[in-house]
Amino acid sequence: MNLILLGAPGAGKGTQAEIICAKMNIPSISTGNILRAAVKEGTEMGLKAKSFMDAGALVPDEVIIGILKERLAQDDCANGFILDGVPRTIAQAEAIETMGIRIDKVLELSVADDVIVERMSGRRVCEKCGASYHIINKKSKVEGVCDLCGGKTVIRKDDQPATVLDRLKAYHEQTEPLVAFYRERGKLAVIPFCPSIEETTAEVMKALEA
């Protein structure tokens, strides 16, 4: 099954992608990872991407989708895949269609903005070892101190409320139109907000079996 995961930053896409991959034995493919791999391997599209990255420019959609097509041609995608973080825009979604990449279902993890702000601004990361915590549901034993190495836990710039709101604004403007795009094509399944990871997974699996 060829899947796309949509949802605002902090909606839990990465977590659900990992679970679906394990259950269905298919790879999760994210834009950042395939870009880095293509550049490292020196593929035709990777070299094109590198020329833009070296110039400090955004990598154009056609190059990103070209790299995606290279990745989807690999053996581990024979039984399906999950796209996480691509497409980000209508232009990318149209490019995926034009390139003949078949998409079976699009899952949108629907989480309210205020829940996402609370979820992300509560994250803490150890400066030394990178261990992650949360001030509500995954507290360190001593506030501000890492359980594993005793390092200081801090809030990353990406998780500060003002930054989270900026990222949500960008998501609503650029990526949210994809919900309507895939709904029109009869491929969209909206996953309602659930308080736990397990409940969300149950809703995801129900949508995939429908």
Across the structure, where does each feature detected by a protein language model lie?
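Glycine-rich phosphate-binding loop of ATP-dependent small-molecule kinases
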Residues: 1-210
